[in-house]
Amino acid sequence: CHTGWLKSAGMLMPMGYMIGNGLVDVQGPADEIESLRTTIEAHFDNASIPSSGDLYYGYSGAFNCLTQGVGDVAFAKTSSYEDHCEGNDWCLDRDQYRILEPHFGQVPSHPVIVNPDNAGDKQDALIAALLALNTDEGGVDILENVLNTPGLIPVTSESHLGSYSDAIENIPGITAYFEAKYDD
């Protein structure tokens, strides 16, 4: 049960890890993104690859897909039970679920990115204002309730992406897909 087509934690990270470690063989041309779908379907038989709005879409959907017996494994968060089972009668008892090893790595959060054209004083002021949210009572509320994060920290692209880049480079056609998508 995947979270959705080309979703980071529910598809790209685990499939990139498994392909890169020789656990799954790529089916189809290595430079076409649809080879990923073919690879998943060949390896997992009845894989659930939902689209936005489908019953099993997202983290809750992947966990529900597993719970309903649609799939044998869900690529979701380790906190899925806590995140999705309170008040949901579709969940099984906690001891009916088992987290499998290895953890595939950590998918980076959604970053706040500063426009490089705003270099210098303007960029520094913007970064300082965003980081000030960490220490301001109203700022903490904004971080938690609007941005859904406990805080902001400055990072480089390399440190932010970490092992994620290594894993997704194994996805067939991913480079061509993103080049075509963002080459405007």
Go through each PLM region and give its residues.
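An extracytoplasmic/periplasmic, membrane-proximal ligand-sensing/linker region
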Residues: A119-D184
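Structural recognition of the beta-strand scaffold that forms the well-ordered cores
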Residues: C1-H2, D72-A76, I113
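Periplasmic-binding protein-like
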Residues: D25-P50, C85-I127, T149
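A ligand-binding cleft/hinge motif common to bilobed small-molecule-binding domains
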Residues: Y17-G20, Y59-D95
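Bilobed "Venus flytrap"/periplasmic-binding protein-like clamshell domains
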Residues: C1-F63, Q68, D141, T149-P150, ...
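Residue-level marker of positions within ordered structural domains that often coincide
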Residues: L23, G71, D117, L131
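Solvent-exposed loop/turn segments at secondary-structure junctions
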Residues: W5-A9, S79-E82, D117-G120
